[in-house]
């Protein structure tokens, strides 16, 4: 739809949120509200998007980047004034239309946007609005219709409405399409002769109606589609609905979610068929999970790729790649930058960071592997530590294929362990050591036994404590 410019209004503070963060940047299902709006507009086929920013505009610009163009509303003087700030970015010489949307209505999806635009074009209307009937419309403006025909007659802001008009339940959702030609001239005719002293965008269709031009209002089938969170209660409602929609989409695509009410999956997550998600699992960011996996329970995965046939149980995976057939957990932690090839096993209380792990590696218990490369088939014994940090710099550990690292081994980086080498349990080796392939490394201190010394040593400790305490 190259002949349509979308103008998204995102300049307001959102004071009812009672937050230091601008309302449109509050997250829903892992994505700021304005992100949902931009994505919905793009999925509807619109490429030319202008976002009107003001309060905390730097946050919005940082998030959206160059995906959109920007207009600035320095002073908050109403919705009509906000759209006017974008007028200079709308080319009226080529005809077409302008879509206006508030930046906080995430459930106006691409299908609804397409439906409104199609109805607008087919009717050759000057303006087309999307409306909804709410059980409790509160202080929102009301839509006025002819009681006999249902024809759209206009709208009235709540503060300007009569008691009878306030009983109307139909409201404008903040979404409208206008004919592009002459749109700026209409905006320049707006005035502030109302209770709030603001430039109302709805005055545009009042002007059009006075001129005898066609303005239509399309009513949404569901009140829930009009949900635009204004406070934390409504934000929680929106979050619950969006997550329910996300979970249902995955289930219809062949994913088993044992308890959808206790599973939290972000909007941009992809999951393959026949994967099973157990309760209390959180999957965030742009995570991709392959088919035939078992995820959870009590697992968190953030912006990672988990390939086919993996098991991730009671563990945390952050910004990492987990190859086919890997087993993670329970209680393992993959910190950012890990790459696991196929069939690796990372077990209880193991922690990895920036670790490249070869195929078939086993690291089952209480180990830390940081800034390390572990070759295929290596075995990492319980309690193995790569000491990679000296307080100033990080150093790498290289462990060759088929190497065997015994329990409670400290590898002081930088260190290289050759293919097939064996390091005996309890050894502390390195730094700057290169262990040859197939070598055996045993690091031991000779045990010293002093019979009867324990009692005298304990007595000395007691005396020292008494002297220190002055008793």
UniProtKB/Swiss-Prot annotation:
<feature type="binding site">
    <location>
        <position position="382"/>
    </location>
    <ligand>
        <name>acetyl-CoA</name>
    </ligand>
</feature>
<feature type="binding site">
    <location>
        <begin position="78"/>
        <end position="79"/>
    </location>
    <ligand>
        <name>UDP-N-acetyl-alpha-D-glucosamine</name>
    </ligand>
</feature>
<feature type="binding site">
    <location>
        <position position="104"/>
    </location>
    <ligand>
        <name>Mg(2+)</name>
    </ligand>
</feature>
<comment type="function">
    <text>Catalyzes the last two sequential reactions in the de novo biosynthetic pathway for UDP-N-acetylglucosamine (UDP-GlcNAc). The C-terminal domain catalyzes the transfer of acetyl group from acetyl coenzyme A to glucosamine-1-phosphate (GlcN-1-P) to produce N-acetylglucosamine-1-phosphate (GlcNAc-1-P), which is converted into UDP-GlcNAc by the transfer of uridine 5-monophosphate (from uridine 5-triphosphate), a reaction catalyzed by the N-terminal domain.</text>
</comment>
<keyword id="KW-0511">Multifunctional enzyme</keyword>
<dbReference type="GO" id="GO:0008360">
    <property type="term" value="P:regulation of cell shape"/>
</dbReference>
<dbReference type="InterPro" id="IPR001451">
    <property type="entry name" value="Hexapep"/>
</dbReference>
<keyword id="KW-0548">Nucleotidyltransferase</keyword>
<dbReference type="Pfam" id="PF12804">
    <property type="entry name" value="NTP_transf_3"/>
</dbReference>
<keyword id="KW-0460">Magnesium</keyword>
<protein>
    <recommendedName>
        <fullName>Bifunctional protein GlmU</fullName>
        <ecNumber>2.7.7.23</ecNumber>
        <ecNumber>2.3.1.157</ecNumber>
    </recommendedName>
</protein>
<feature type="region of interest" description="Linker">
    <location>
        <begin position="233"/>
        <end position="253"/>
    </location>
</feature>
<keyword id="KW-0012">Acyltransferase</keyword>
<keyword id="KW-0479">Metal-binding</keyword>
<dbReference type="Pfam" id="PF00132">
    <property type="entry name" value="Hexapep"/>
</dbReference>
<feature type="region of interest" description="N-acetyltransferase">
    <location>
        <begin position="254"/>
        <end position="471"/>
    </location>
</feature>
<dbReference type="GO" id="GO:0016020">
    <property type="term" value="C:membrane"/>
</dbReference>
<feature type="binding site">
    <location>
        <position position="368"/>
    </location>
    <ligand>
        <name>UDP-N-acetyl-alpha-D-glucosamine</name>
    </ligand>
</feature>
<feature type="binding site">
    <location>
        <begin position="102"/>
        <end position="104"/>
    </location>
    <ligand>
        <name>UDP-N-acetyl-alpha-D-glucosamine</name>
    </ligand>
</feature>
<dbReference type="InterPro" id="IPR011004">
    <property type="entry name" value="Trimer_LpxA-like_sf"/>
</dbReference>
<keyword id="KW-0573">Peptidoglycan synthesis</keyword>
<feature type="binding site">
    <location>
        <position position="73"/>
    </location>
    <ligand>
        <name>UDP-N-acetyl-alpha-D-glucosamine</name>
    </ligand>
</feature>
<feature type="binding site">
    <location>
        <position position="353"/>
    </location>
    <ligand>
        <name>UDP-N-acetyl-alpha-D-glucosamine</name>
    </ligand>
</feature>
<feature type="binding site">
    <location>
        <position position="425"/>
    </location>
    <ligand>
        <name>acetyl-CoA</name>
    </ligand>
</feature>
<keyword id="KW-0808">Transferase</keyword>
<dbReference type="GO" id="GO:0071555">
    <property type="term" value="P:cell wall organization"/>
</dbReference>
<keyword id="KW-0961">Cell wall biogenesis/degradation</keyword>
<dbReference type="GO" id="GO:0000287">
    <property type="term" value="F:magnesium ion binding"/>
</dbReference>
<feature type="binding site">
    <location>
        <position position="335"/>
    </location>
    <ligand>
        <name>UDP-N-acetyl-alpha-D-glucosamine</name>
    </ligand>
</feature>
<feature type="active site" description="Proton acceptor">
    <location>
        <position position="365"/>
    </location>
</feature>
<feature type="binding site">
    <location>
        <begin position="9"/>
        <end position="12"/>
    </location>
    <ligand>
        <name>UDP-N-acetyl-alpha-D-glucosamine</name>
    </ligand>
</feature>
<feature type="binding site">
    <location>
        <position position="444"/>
    </location>
    <ligand>
        <name>acetyl-CoA</name>
    </ligand>
</feature>
<keyword id="KW-0963">Cytoplasm</keyword>
<feature type="binding site">
    <location>
        <position position="379"/>
    </location>
    <ligand>
        <name>UDP-N-acetyl-alpha-D-glucosamine</name>
    </ligand>
</feature>
<keyword id="KW-0677">Repeat</keyword>
<feature type="binding site">
    <location>
        <position position="141"/>
    </location>
    <ligand>
        <name>UDP-N-acetyl-alpha-D-glucosamine</name>
    </ligand>
</feature>
<dbReference type="GO" id="GO:0000902">
    <property type="term" value="P:cell morphogenesis"/>
</dbReference>
<dbReference type="InterPro" id="IPR050065">
    <property type="entry name" value="GlmU-like"/>
</dbReference>
<feature type="binding site">
    <location>
        <position position="230"/>
    </location>
    <ligand>
        <name>Mg(2+)</name>
    </ligand>
</feature>
<comment type="similarity">
    <text>In the N-terminal section; belongs to the N-acetylglucosamine-1-phosphate uridyltransferase family.</text>
</comment>
<feature type="binding site">
    <location>
        <begin position="388"/>
        <end position="389"/>
    </location>
    <ligand>
        <name>acetyl-CoA</name>
    </ligand>
</feature>
<dbReference type="InterPro" id="IPR018357">
    <property type="entry name" value="Hexapep_transf_CS"/>
</dbReference>
């Amino acid at each position: 739809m190259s002949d349509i410019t979308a103008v998204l209004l995102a300049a307001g503070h959102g004071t009812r949120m009672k937050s230091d963060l601008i309302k449109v940047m509050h997250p829903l299902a892992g994505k700021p509200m304005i992100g949902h709006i931009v994505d919905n507009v793009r999925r509807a086929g619109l490429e030319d998007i202008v976002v009107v920013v003001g309060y905390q505009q730097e946050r919005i610009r940082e998030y959206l980047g160059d995906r959109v163009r920007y207009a600035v509303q320095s002073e908050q003087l109403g919705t009509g004034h906000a759209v006017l700030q974008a007028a200079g970015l709308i080319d009226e010489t080529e005809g077409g239309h302008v879509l206006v949307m508030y930046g906080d209505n995430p459930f106006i999806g691409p299908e609804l946007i397409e439906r409104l635009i199609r109805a607008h074009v087919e009717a050759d209307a000057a303006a087309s609005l999307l409306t909804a009937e709410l059980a409790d419309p509160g202080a929102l403006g009301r839509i006025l219709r002819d009681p006999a025909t249902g024809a759209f007659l206009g709208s009235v802001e709540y503060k300007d409405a009569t008691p009878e008009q306030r009983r109307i339940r139909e409201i404008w959702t903040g979404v409208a399409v206008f004919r592009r030609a002459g749109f700026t001239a209409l905006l320049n005719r707006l005035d502030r002769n109302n209770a709030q002293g603001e430039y109302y965008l709805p005055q545009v269709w009042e002007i059009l109606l006075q001129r005898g031009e066609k303005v239509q209002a399309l009513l949404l089938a569901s009140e829930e589609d009009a949900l635009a969170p204004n406070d934390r209660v409504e934000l929680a409602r929106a979050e619950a609905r969006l997550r329910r929609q996300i979970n249902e989409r995955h289930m219809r695509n062949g994913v088993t979610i044992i308890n959808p009410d206790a599973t939290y999956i972000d909007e941009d997550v992809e999951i393959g068929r026949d994967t099973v998600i157990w309760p209390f699992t959180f999957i965030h960011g742009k995570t991709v999970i392959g088919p035939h996996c078992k995820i959870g329970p009590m697992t968190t995965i953030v912006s990672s790729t988990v390939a086919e046939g993996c098991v991730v149980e009671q563990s945390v995976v952050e910004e990492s790649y987990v190859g086919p057939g890997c087993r993670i957990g329970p209680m393992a932690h993959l910190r950012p930058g890990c790459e696991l090839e196929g069939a690796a096993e990372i077990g209880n209380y193991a922690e990895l960071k920036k670790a490249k792990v070869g195929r078939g590696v086993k690291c089952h218990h209480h180990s830390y592997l940081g800034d390390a490369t572990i070759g295929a088939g290596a075995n990492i014994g319980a309690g193995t530590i790569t000491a990679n940090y000296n307080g100033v710099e990080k150093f790498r550990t290289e462990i060759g294929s088929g190497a065997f690292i015994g329990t409670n081994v400290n590898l002081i980086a930088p260190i290289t362990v050759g293919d097939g080498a064996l390091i005996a349990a309890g050894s502390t080796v390195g730094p700057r050591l290169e262990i040859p392939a197939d070598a055996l490394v045993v690091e031991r201190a000779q045990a010293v036994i002093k019979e009867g010394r324990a009692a005298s040593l304990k007595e000395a400790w007691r005396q020292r404590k008494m002297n220190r305490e002055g008793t």
